[in-house]
Amino acid sequence: MISKINGKLFADMIIQGAQNLSNNADLVDSLNVYPVPDGDTGTNMNLTITSGREEVENNLSQNIGELGKTFSKGLLMGARGNSGVILSQLFRGFCKNIEGEKEISVQQFAESFQAGVETAYKAVMKPVEGTILTVAKDAAKAAMDYVDQAEDCVDLMVHVIEAASESLDNTPNLLAVLKEVGVVDSGGKGLLCVYEGFLKGLKGEKVEAQAPKLDTESFVNDDHDFHGVINTEDIVYGYCTEMMVRFGKNKKAFDEQEFRNDMSEFGDSLLVINDDEIVKVHVHTEHPGDVFNYGQKYGELIKLKVENMREQHREVIRKEQDGIQNKATNESKTVETAIVTISVGDGIAELFKSMGATHIISGGQTMNPSTEDIVKVIEQSKCKRAIILPNNKNIMMASEQAASIVEAETVVIPTKSIPQGISALFQYDQESNLEDNKSHMNDALETVQSGSITFAVRDTKIDGIEIKKDEFMGLAEDKIVISDFNQFHAVKGLLSKLLNEDSEILTMISGEDADNSITNQIIDWIESEYPDVEVEQHEGGQPIYQYFFAVE
């Protein structure tokens, strides 16, 4: 009979729960609705609870209240992805309920499950039923309904697991997309794995490891460790050049298409934003003076910036060779406003950096950074203010959680894709205050449609589309709109959904697996089918996704 749970027993439960989730992480990942090759729910929940487990193992206590604080802190800082954040919030509420206790009774055990559910629901802006939240809620309700009959904590835990399993099986009836794909909710399955491990711990049993231990080191990659791979002499256009031009009455009439065409002759990485009174330009060029002279044809130059990217690159190489440049570089940086972007791909990181991002965290579709990764970057920058660009919907909650922890005044711009992040960052003005920048950057999100091309990792049917393993899928925002074994056909199908007669600019970001011949084929097709659309092509170097597209 186990009528009480103390810190030592709770630690055993946590360790076995974490191990059971680790053993089943791949299974949980396989339940993800979209068949994209991302490490997602299982990976994120596993990394999150592993962070909590490691914190517990390093700070063991007989006092369950103290151990709960330790576990909650580890989960909070290690939370990755939306599923990881929700898991951390479930146990934040659970552990808050046992605060100050040396040990807890069966009644308190049941009440703690309920407290966790209440905390998690409050943390999610728009709770969706048929998810991990529902499984947790149904399990907690069962615990509260059964607690008076429970013989001990083991008996209660058995009942919690039965209710969670039944709730998990019912998730397809609550969420249509689960029923269409033929899976149960992945987050709910992950939570059930944790609960099953808890029961093992309560009974004094051990979950044997079936998977290699995960490396939970930070994914911070500020200033990029990849500079040494690129030769300075390989930089074709050496000056990152920006200008703002206020249109003049007696100057040349502004035609945006003509302006873009002429500007594109000066270099690459061209970005142009026009608001009828002012045009803002970002371009990498060999001749900044020519860019400024051209801008003066249209009006008054009000803001200019030129940075020598070759010299910046040499400096980074020097620091790396001296052993100065590493993941801890952030500690030496002090900025008034830290602009933190999350991205993956050398080219994308370089583009963000050239546009003013002060810190790059390596992460995205294939690996979500933790709350702690984001917190560390902001705190080590010693900034007064911070702006976070998640650039992925699954990094949003960790970003918001980080913003609530740090001392600096911090805002999260809800960018769900790399193209949205680029558009938002282009609106940043270092002379403006945080609220104005937040407003302008949020407004920029309304002007961008995002698309991407990747491949399917399994057969499925979703949104009415039959998908075969290894087909190329076109996603408009988060919705699969086409699937085809021919990559070019998939791209055409996707762009036909994104482009229309009002489209002006198409930004194409090529991934590390993009084929140059297909890239050229795409550009030729766009120029033929959509002659009024200006194409801007960048080498992003991102894995998994052959192309990102942005339509404005």
From Swiss-Prot:
Any one GO MF annotation of this record: glycerone kinase activity
The identity of this protein, by name, is Uncharacterized protein SERP0792
PROSITE patterns xref list: DHAL
Residue ranges of the DhaL domain? 8-200
Gene Ontology biological-process annotations: glycerol metabolic process
Identify the domain of life: Bacteria
Q: Which organism is it from?
A: Staphylococcus epidermidis (strain ATCC 35984 / DSM 28319 / BCRC 17069 / CCUG 31568 / BM 3577 / RP62A)
UniProt cross-references to InterPro entries, sorted A to Z: DegV_domain_contain (IPR050270), DhaL_dom (IPR004007), DhaL_dom_sf (IPR036117), FakA-like_C (IPR033470), FakA-like_M (IPR048394), YloV-like (IPR019986)
Give any Pfam family that matches: FakA-like_C
